[in-house]
Amino acid sequence: SLSCLKPCTKWSQKYAGMSGMGERLIGMGKYRKSRAFSPEGFFECEGRGLKWLGEAQSQGGPRVVDVYDWGKDYLDIERVNACGPTIQAARDFGVALAHMHDAGAEHFGSAPTGYDGTCYFGPLQDPVPMDTGAWDDVATYLADGRLRPMVRLGMKRRELTDYDMELTEAVIDALPDILGKAANDKPARVHGDLWSGNVMWTADSGDVEAVLIDPAAHGGHREEDLAMLDLFGMSYLTDILEGYQSAHPLKAGWQDRITLWQLYPIAGHCVFFGGGYVSQYRAMCR
């Protein structure tokens, strides 16, 4: 576990002052995210990802923010009034998250249903392409769809070096041993960027409940989302995990694999921010 890590800055602080982007209310109950000259399909990908995750609500999945409309440069979503979490809400969220994962995906690396463009990972101001594909095994998906592409991008931006790729290749070589029986898990319907800032808590409907926002939704491994919850700290994480385990027990050794699943987002932080995240990535690989 690396819960002691903290983001060096919020996305909005990192890119403060950049024009042509933002988030604002556009009416009662409606919220607009916008960015001029956004990458092709960026907001459609997020919108379809939210809808895809939301489809799992019929199977007991968590509430997902409603999507009203999207265009090339904007996404209109439901406004949610935030409040603090409770132990019961956290446990209920864990149960619901397990059900969302159980809703599944066609392959590891699948894009949200109905979307065939580029998927993205990262902040509104600097999203990077996230590979999609039809990998049948989790090790190949993690190696070819996640770790290698992100480290290559870090090298292109001169934040990472050949040494980091060597460390990454060593991890990839060890994946069969690291994954263990988790390699047998079927593709899950994952949020893909489930740090604490993308889990809102609200009492809009009465009892406190979690609402998911800002996904990088895809077919992945269920432990990805749990590792992201752990990465920068999450209120009542123990209760969330207890709820999750009650609905879908995790494969033995899942705690030891948390660092593995955190490599991709930390490599992403190397790409976006550089600095101390590079040494952190190297330490995690070792």
Say what each PLM segment does.
Residues 17-26:
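ATP-binding glycine-rich phosphate-binding loop
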